Amino acid sequence: MTEQATKPRNSSHLIGGFFGGLTSAVALQPLDLLKTRIQQDKKATLWKNLKEIDSPLQLWRGTLPSALRTSIGSALYLSCLNLMRSSLAKRRNAVPSLTNDSNIVYNKSSSLPRLTMYENLLTGAFARGLVGYITMPITVIKVRYESTLYNYSSLKEAITHIYTKEGLFGFFRGFGATCLRDAPYAGLYVLLYEKSKQLLPMVLPSRFIHYNPEGGFTTYTSTTVNTTSAVLSASLATTVTAPFDTIKTRMQLEPSKFTNSFNTFTSIVKNENVLKLFSGLSMRLARKAFSAGIAWGIYEELVKRFM
């Protein structure tokens, strides 16, 4: 099998990213909604917000903008990430082949190029920052649609209100905090994810490790390795970047009060407490961990299917 034959087509990353992102967004929307509502009020608790929900369907409020943002964003991000990582791997002549055991002894669960930890960190951060800017308007609409501070009845009403009150800048409100959260998160995530895929096969019980006739892992084994790696990596990266998520949410919900990232940070620390910077972490942790497991598990397998 030649390098050209083993190289995934670019469209496979768009398709894999889109469906992985869409599935995780719809399935985990309740966690995202609860996280937003906990962060908007310094006295809010999970139990208090759950009691205010009149019907289970209300937990999926804001699903459309969330699904659009996550599916489109995931497709663009993973395509952009693959383009950068493949370009770097080509230059170093390090694109792995499923038939070259010396190259893939630690990453037989994946068909993605293998880079250094430093390269994984930088490509993940840069790709996320770029795509985050492109999808920022959808993010702002999504956050406000989920919040109880705005009672939008439709996406059209949300768009009209934001544009009328704040102009085009309103659709990019909180981008600085979002970028400070997402770029480090993505960089850390890709670094940890790729390293976990190398290490997990070495520590998993032998009953979980099965090989196909070509020498790579079976679908069961690769899915186990990739999904577990995604959950572990997302959990750690989410915890580290949690304060930026709280700052971003406050800026998008109360733009007149919180005008910039530093002002928001000092206000929370001074008027509330440092722990409030981690408000909603349990919801975000659960959502990001499961989301990464679902999205990256689907993405990795679809990429291999479209090779």
Curated annotation (Swiss-Prot):
GO terms for molecular function: glycine transmembrane transporter activity. Its main location: mitochondrion. The chain crosses the membrane at residues 14-39, 62-88, 121-146, 174-197, 225-251, 280-298. One of its GO terms (biological process) is glycine import into mitochondrion. The keyword Isomerase does not apply. It is a multi-pass membrane protein. It catalyses: glycine(in) = glycine(out). PANTHER family: MITOCHONDRIAL GLYCINE TRANSPORTER (PTHR46181:SF3). This is Mitochondrial glycine transporter. It comes from Saccharomyces cerevisiae (strain ATCC 204508 / S288c) (Baker's yeast). The lineage of its organism: Eukaryota, Fungi, Dikarya, Ascomycota, Saccharomycotina. The gene is HEM25.
